Amino acid sequence: MSSSFGKIFRVSTFGESHGGGVGVILDGCPPKLKIDIKLIQNELDRRRPGQSDITTPRNEDDKIEILSGIKEGLTLGTPIAMLVRNKDQRPGDYNNLEQVFRPSHADGTYHLKYGIQAGSGGGRASARETIGRVAAGAVAKQLLKNLCNTEILSWVKRIHDIDSDVNKEKISLNKIDSNIVRCPDEKVSAEMIDRIKDLKRQGDSCGGVIECLVRNVPSGLGMPVFDKLEADLAKALMSLPATKGFEIGSGFSGTYLKGSEHNDSFIKSDDISKLRTTSNNSGGIQGGISNGENIEMKIAFKPTATIGKEQKTVNAEGKEVLMKAKGRHDPCVLPRAVPMVDAMVALVLADHLLLNNAQCGLMKN
């Protein structure tokens, strides 16, 4: 099972939903980088369970412990180890699921592959695994902000069939976090919240779409063929729990356009390193390499698989059974997935920034 990600800026996560704790080891972070621990905690608080009545009622404070790699607010260049201890585990909630495969959950495929799985909370398939990613991503966000003034903003674009209309030029973190669903469109955010609450009362769930905008992206990130920037972003984001789709730039809607309509024309510039385009259908990446425009992406999340409705399934012996989940689960993962998307995008960009400097840094004037 692969639990590591990245080439130079490399993370390895560990832990399980109902084990002693979860965490991450971040290797390859440059030395003497200023790190604000409060900003790491802020990102974890945005991901934390029990933060509102549209998330899981599991009550965890998710306080970060820095075990190594940072001293007096500066990185040492050595591995950064971070840990969050689990405090509100209830493995007993899953006694009836130990040998039963939840529909559309990883229980069945884990059992098919390994012949054994951590029944309580889904083990490594739990969203609690993302704590390590979010902590490491918070370090990556500070690296990108300090070195390039790069800003990563993600928000809930759609919940179920309720879509939003957001002015990307005016989007800000304060607007995103102004409500519990993390949709900056005030007109529809209340409707989204009501929909999630209604489905929660029914013992059901829903999915949706998160949109991500990255500003002040350095040009030249990414490499041709197998290490294209959008390919690595897709892999990173599709590795998050419950993701089912990835789109960059015009995405699938671009297939309805002609080349003359879709092409992003370049604008004359005295500085070729600051080349700009009249449109951004490419989503900030061309030929697998960032062009300096904003990176724009959308990520689709399926409805939460574990629900409170009775469902037909089979057990480990292949016998048909009826099951009804008793654990604490999100009726919709999207409000808490926003910082997860931020984190994975930050990790990819930080890794490619270091890779680009390693390959091309010495050759630049």
From Swiss-Prot:
Subunit structure: Homotetramer.
Catalytic activity: 5-O-(1-carboxyvinyl)-3-phosphoshikimate = chorismate + phosphate
EC number: 4.2.3.5
Entry binding sites for NADP(+): 47
PANTHER family: CHORISMATE SYNTHASE
GO biological process: amino acid biosynthetic process; aromatic amino acid family biosynthetic process; chorismate biosynthetic process
Pfam families: Chorismate_synt (PF01264)
Cross-referenced SUPFAM superfamilies: Chorismate synthase, AroC
Protein name (record): Chorismate synthase
Residue numbers binding FMN: 124-126, 287, 302-306, 328
Enzyme class (EC, first level): lyase
Described function: This reaction introduces a second double bond into the aromatic ring system.
Cofactor binding notes: Reduced FMN (FMNH(2)).
Disulphide bridges, residue numbers: none
The encoding gene: aroC
Family note: Belongs to the chorismate synthase family.
GO CC terms of this entry: cytosol
